[in-house]
Amino acid sequence: MSLGVIAAAIAIGLSALGAGIGNGLIVSRTIEGVARQPELKGALQTIMFIGVALVEALPIIGVVIAFIVMNK
């Protein structure tokens, strides 16, 4: 097994771990906000979905970097 494959696995794993933690924090804070101010549910959901989309970009970038590292 080459070092490129190991590096790719580490890149994908760490990016997925970071995204999972980030998504959990975003959703939990959104639920707390809706519990405090139910009238802002729509605005908070919109902001949450934008935040989740930005956090999910991290694993996609990690996969791209992993493919680049594997092919070198």
Swiss-Prot record:
<dbReference type="Pfam" id="PF00137">
    <property type="entry name" value="ATP-synt_C"/>
</dbReference>
<dbReference type="InterPro" id="IPR002379">
    <property type="entry name" value="ATPase_proteolipid_c-like_dom"/>
</dbReference>
<keyword id="KW-0446">Lipid-binding</keyword>
<dbReference type="GO" id="GO:0045259">
    <property type="term" value="C:proton-transporting ATP synthase complex"/>
</dbReference>
<protein>
    <recommendedName>
        <fullName>ATP synthase subunit c</fullName>
    </recommendedName>
</protein>
<comment type="function">
    <text>F(1)F(0) ATP synthase produces ATP from ADP in the presence of a proton or sodium gradient. F-type ATPases consist of two structural domains, F(1) containing the extramembraneous catalytic core and F(0) containing the membrane proton channel, linked together by a central stalk and a peripheral stalk. During catalysis, ATP synthesis in the catalytic domain of F(1) is coupled via a rotary mechanism of the central stalk subunits to proton translocation.</text>
</comment>
<dbReference type="GO" id="GO:0008289">
    <property type="term" value="F:lipid binding"/>
</dbReference>
<dbReference type="InterPro" id="IPR020537">
    <property type="entry name" value="ATP_synth_F0_csu_DDCD_BS"/>
</dbReference>
<dbReference type="InterPro" id="IPR000454">
    <property type="entry name" value="ATP_synth_F0_csu"/>
</dbReference>
<keyword id="KW-0375">Hydrogen ion transport</keyword>
<keyword id="KW-0472">Membrane</keyword>
<dbReference type="GO" id="GO:0005886">
    <property type="term" value="C:plasma membrane"/>
</dbReference>
<dbReference type="InterPro" id="IPR035921">
    <property type="entry name" value="F/V-ATP_Csub_sf"/>
</dbReference>
<keyword id="KW-1003">Cell membrane</keyword>
<keyword id="KW-1133">Transmembrane helix</keyword>
<feature type="site" description="Reversibly protonated during proton transport">
    <location>
        <position position="56"/>
    </location>
</feature>
<keyword id="KW-0812">Transmembrane</keyword>
<comment type="subunit">
    <text>F-type ATPases have 2 components, F(1) - the catalytic core - and F(0) - the membrane proton channel. F(1) has five subunits: alpha(3), beta(3), gamma(1), delta(1), epsilon(1). F(0) has three main subunits: a(1), b(2) and c(10-14). The alpha and beta chains form an alternating ring which encloses part of the gamma chain. F(1) is attached to F(0) by a central stalk formed by the gamma and epsilon chains, while a peripheral stalk is formed by the delta and b chains.</text>
</comment>
<comment type="function">
    <text>Key component of the F(0) channel; it plays a direct role in translocation across the membrane. A homomeric c-ring of between 10-14 subunits forms the central stalk rotor element with the F(1) delta and epsilon subunits.</text>
</comment>
<keyword id="KW-0406">Ion transport</keyword>
<dbReference type="InterPro" id="IPR005953">
    <property type="entry name" value="ATP_synth_csu_bac/chlpt"/>
</dbReference>
<keyword id="KW-0066">ATP synthesis</keyword>
<comment type="similarity">
    <text>Belongs to the ATPase C chain family.</text>
</comment>
<dbReference type="GO" id="GO:0015986">
    <property type="term" value="P:proton motive force-driven ATP synthesis"/>
</dbReference>
<dbReference type="GO" id="GO:0046933">
    <property type="term" value="F:proton-transporting ATP synthase activity, rotational mechanism"/>
</dbReference>
<keyword id="KW-0813">Transport</keyword>
<feature type="transmembrane region" description="Helical">
    <location>
        <begin position="1"/>
        <end position="21"/>
    </location>
</feature>
<dbReference type="InterPro" id="IPR038662">
    <property type="entry name" value="ATP_synth_F0_csu_sf"/>
</dbReference>
<dbReference type="GO" id="GO:0033177">
    <property type="term" value="C:proton-transporting two-sector ATPase complex, proton-transporting domain"/>
</dbReference>
<feature type="transmembrane region" description="Helical">
    <location>
        <begin position="49"/>
        <end position="69"/>
    </location>
</feature>
<keyword id="KW-0138">CF(0)</keyword>
